[in-house]
Amino acid sequence: MFGLLRHLFKFQFLFVVAAVLGGIYHTEIRQFLRRQTDNYLDQAGQDASIPLAFQAGDDIGTLFTPAELAKFNGEEEGRPLYLALLGSVFDVSRGIKHYGSGCSYNFFVGRDASVSFISGDFETYDPETADDVLTLKPDDLIGLAGWRDFYQKDYVYKGRVIGRFYDEKGALTTYHHKFLELLEQARDAKRQVEELRARYPGCNIEWSEERGTRVWCTTTSGDGKERSWIGYPRKLYSRGNKSFQCACVPDAELDEIDAGGKVAHGDAMLKPYDNCEPQARECFYRV
């Protein structure tokens, strides 16, 4: 057994040295080494998760084609379970209770089904759209990044999928750069919302058939934390959203906001409720 390993490593080492000297150490060579190790492990009947040629000298790891990744779907005994998220591949074998055949998340194994992490669709897989995330909402992009962080923390990173997010050399594609740009925009927007909520806490709200929707402010409305002021209810609009939320505006800013629909932060805007007195502590409206 160990003699065979030494023979394999010696062969691999000589191959890599020759490739480096010849200036041709590219993806094809790494893929060749991985296939050789796979074949050896299959013949030896050992656990294919042993990291022999799977380890790369950089943070790229192994480059998988979609077809190669599909081999790690749990159908072949002895192979580990791999899934991809946003083009990154993780070994989820230790979570076999969740990712094994017939289990809840087996749908994700052997493929990149990033969109399903958001949609919750574990039945339909379309390889043309399964990892096309650019049409998702900003909060969903943040959610996907959170899932990726989870896998990086709790599971073993194995490499990258050649396709939408990474090219044949493992470099980020134009699509991936666009995703990162949209993700940063989403995070900026979320930070703005959090700052707005801290500056203008939410209102209490209730509905009745008789009076419609009632909104009002108290010293704990919004996040439930005690503050020194009560505030007055106003409609808070955010960028690209026709709907509004109720926000409590402090006395010191009330006149300035009502004078011209003051932009409170970025593209957010505060406006008074119709048919409600400027300094009323509660307002009523019907949708």
Curated annotation (Swiss-Prot):
Chief localization: secreted
Keyword Ion transport: no
SUPFAM superfamilies: Cytochrome b5-like heme/steroid binding domain
Domain Cytochrome b5 heme-binding: 61-146
Superkingdom of source: Eukaryota
Localisation per UniProt entry: Secreted
Coiled coil ranges: 175-204
Free-text note on domains in this protein's UniProt record: The cytochrome b5 heme-binding domain was proven to bind heme, although it lacks the conserved iron-binding His residues at position 99 and 126.
Record function comment: Heme-binding protein.
Protein's UniProt name: Neuferricin homolog
Lineage: Eukaryota, Metazoa, Ecdysozoa, Arthropoda, Hexapoda
